[in-house]
Amino acid sequence: MSRFSAVGVLLICLVSACSDGANDQRTYVLTTGTTGGTFYPVGVALSTLVSARAEEGFSLTAISSAGSMENIKLLRDNQAQFGLILGTFAAWAYDGVGPISTPQPHIRSISAMWPNVEHFVLRSDLVIDGTVSDLAKLKGERYSIGMRNSGAEHTGLYIFDALGVDYTEDLSIAYLGYGPSTNALQDGNIVGMNVPAGPPVTAIARAYALLGEGMTILEFSEEEMAAINQQFPLWDFYELLPGTYPRQDKPVTTAYSSNVFVVRDDVSEEVVYNMTKLLWDNLATLQEIHSATKSMVIEAALKGIPVPLHKGALRYYKENGVEIPEHLLGG
């Protein structure tokens, strides 16, 4: 049994043990991601924390999904009331831009979660300056952007547009998942791949182990960071320290955006306040469940959030002395 499977069984047992006598509570749905990703085990852990505290007056059921795009739809249709989504998708959904053409004004933020780190990989013999703008100089090469309709595809193409990478004319785009991208890079079927995720990423670790100096993670310059933040200030610099991956002996300055915990605006202030309090009061428990959450600190709870806070979350942060950016007010 895998580690996550074992954790899942344990959490389900805990939920069952704590569910007696709670049938009169309002049950909310938290939509997460695929069972093999990070959103799902963290979502299950959150639902377990709620269920273990019947005095909160509500319960939370975590469900798996295809990820951020489906989560937006489930929130829109009120089939889910809470969700974990990429920060880019939160911005697109709220304003109705990019791949989400209709504004979703009902979405509110609870907290930034762990970082979603950009890994734009390129075969080393094609590297010129060592930054992501090198991708604009490729002509006719095959590059993997991620699976179709995935967060990797949409955020990758958004960054390409911001940096002037003509992926329709200059590149031959491949739509491969992370593992298949590593295989294709090793086999010479692609020259690079886009892998946004919380490090260390298994696919990147495998690529380093297989190719070593034959592959490079491209860096972001100040100018490139300004370009991708021009419409939505979502990204910041992230340093991959030496040793993050095997055979990586130098630091890499890349970019990250936050994954965001969101909620519908019609969920009561009291419920969202209690959910926010529960999240931060039990952070150590979440960090035992999944290592991605170990980077979470309340001082960065609002960093990279593009959508106004729910009133319940706003009340919690005010009570705890967290400085609140103006664009997050008015939720």
Please report, for each region that a protein language model flagged, where it lies by residue.
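An extracytoplasmic/periplasmic, membrane-proximal ligand-sensing/linker region
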Residues: 197-219, 229, 270-331
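C-terminal motif of bacterial Sec signal peptides marking the signal peptidase cleavage site
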Residues: 14-17
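N-terminal segment of the mature folded domain
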Residues: 71-114
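Pocket-lining segment of extracytoplasmic ligand-binding domains
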Residues: 87-89, 97-98, 109, 124-127, ...
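Bacterial signal peptide processing site
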Residues: 19-21
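Bacterial N-terminal signal peptides that target proteins for export
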Residues: 1-7
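Ligand-binding clefts/hinges and TM-proximal coupling segments of bilobed small-molecule sensing domains
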Residues: 134, 139-158, 233-305
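Bilobed "Venus flytrap"/periplasmic-binding protein-like clamshell domains
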Residues: 25-53, 58-61, 116-187, 299, ...
